[in-house]
């Protein structure tokens, strides 16, 4: 959804997958930043654990890419982790939620990104970016589900 009153145009993208593992197993892999490259394409991540910890990611192929700095703004094991993107390229929030389903889980990943664009351009960019981003998140979550 695009907010026409804001100078930065927000973009919300969500994907979800069923995982045949209990919430603690999902949480452990989800917050093992050093393993994110196993399920998120073209990404290397390192960082701490817990509220206020810093997480740093590199998204790209070879030398072409960008650094994504984040601060953990919510930490509620094994259910919810929110990171605040603070870099120059990516700003907004990444929300990772684990929903218990019996002895298994649903893993929902939402990105609320602040596009540095005027509202009209943000709306147009959202039409282009959203389906690509949704497919990327969904593909990553399918890989994640196979790892646990």
Language-model features, listed with the residues they occupy:
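Intrinsic-disorder/low-complexity, polar/charged segments enriched in Ser/Thr/Lys/Arg/Asp/Glu/Gln
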Residues: 10-18, 54, 67, 80, ...
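Short beta-edge strand/loop motif at the mouth of beta-sheet-based domains
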Residues: 14, 34-69, 75-80
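Hydrophobic/aromatic beta-strand elements that line small-molecule binding cavities or substrate pockets
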Residues: 15-17, 43, 68-74, 85, ...
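Short strand-connecting beta-turns/loops that link adjacent beta-strands
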Residues: 22, 50, 77-78, 88, ...
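Hydrophobic pocket/interface hotspot
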Residues: 26-30, 36, 55-57, 72, ...
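Beta-strand/loop substructures that line and gate deep hydrophobic ligand-binding cavities in soluble
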Residues: 86-139
């Amino acid at each position: 959804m695009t907010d026409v009153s804001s100078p930065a145009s927000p973009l919300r993208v969500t994907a979800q997958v069923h995982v045949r593992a209990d919430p603690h197993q999902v949480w452990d892999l989800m917050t093992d930043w050093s393993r994110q490259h196993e399920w998120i394409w073209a990404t290397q991540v390192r960082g701490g654990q817990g509220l206020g910890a810093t997480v740093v990611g590199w998204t790209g192929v070879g030398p072409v890419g960008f650094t994504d700095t984040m601060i953990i703004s919510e930490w509620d094991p094994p259910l919810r982790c929110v990171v605040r993107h603070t870099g120059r390229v990516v700003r907004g929030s990444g929300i990772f939620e684990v929903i218990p389903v019996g002895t298994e889980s649903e893993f929902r990943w939402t990105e609320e990104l602040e596009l540095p664009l005027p509202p009209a351009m943000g709306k147009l960019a959202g039409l282009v970016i959203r389906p690509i981003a949704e497919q990327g998140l969904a593909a990553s979550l399918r890989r994640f589900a196979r790892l646990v």
